[in-house]
A protein has these predicted regions:
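Mid-to-C-terminal alpha-helical segments outside catalytic/metal-binding sites
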Residues: 102-142
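Active-site phosphate/pyrophosphate- and oxyanion-stabilizing loops and adjacent acidic/basic residues
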Residues: 67-68, 107
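Divalent metal-binding pocket/active-site signature
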Residues: 1-48, 60-61, 68-69, 73, ...
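Non-cysteine beta-strand/loop elements that form the S-adenosyl-L-methionine
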Residues: 76-84
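Short, basic, glycine/proline-bearing loop/turn elements
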Residues: 49-55
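Amphipathic alpha-helical segments at domain termini/boundaries
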Residues: 87-89
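Short glycine-rich anion-binding loops that position phosphate/pyrophosphate groups of nucleotides
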Residues: 57-58, 85
Length: 142
């Protein structure tokens, strides 16, 4: 990824300390997919230039920590994700997830961030284009 100047996508599941040690060592650009860390870690990660992805799990009852992390993060480093076919948002939890359900995650995140849903959708789409180099003038290849 570094040689090709491409982002990496990391899924850190119950391995925050070793993951952050690797991030300190290699300083990659990319995304923490399905972010599950706390607000303090989110602040550190985004200060390193990383993006944080939030999916259907952000709509679950126990998602307070993830939502606090989203609130602690710069809006230009937040992403919406689906994690298809898993982690469908409430009210579809336990069912097959698909990209058509992302609006449910956006609604919860927008409410928590106190921004209009359309603004969140526009912003996170622009963030995705930026991190993958799909902006105008970008390479257009991922």
């Amino acid at each position: 990824a570094r040689e090709l100047d491409k982002p990496i996508i990391l899924h850190d599941r119950e391995a925050h300390a070793p993951m952050y040690e690797l991030l300190r060592k290699y300083k990659p650009k990319g995304i923490l997919h399905c972010y599950s860390g706390n607000a303090d870690d989110a602040e550190w990660l985004t200060a390193q230039g990383l993006y944080l992805g939030f999916g259907g799990s952000a709509t679950f009852k126990g998602a307070r920590r993830a939502l606090e992390a989203a609130k602690a993060s710069p809006p230009e480093q937040l992403l919406l994700e689906t994690d298809c076919p898993y982690m469908a948002p409430v009210p579809f939890r336990g069912k097959r997830n698909d990209s058509g359900l992302i609006a449910h995650t956006a609604a919860v995140l927008a409410r928590e961030l106190d921004v209009p849903e359309e603004e969140l959708l526009t912003r996170t789409a622009a963030n995705a284009r930026r991190v993958f180099g799909l902006e105008e003038g970008g390479s257009g290849t991922v």
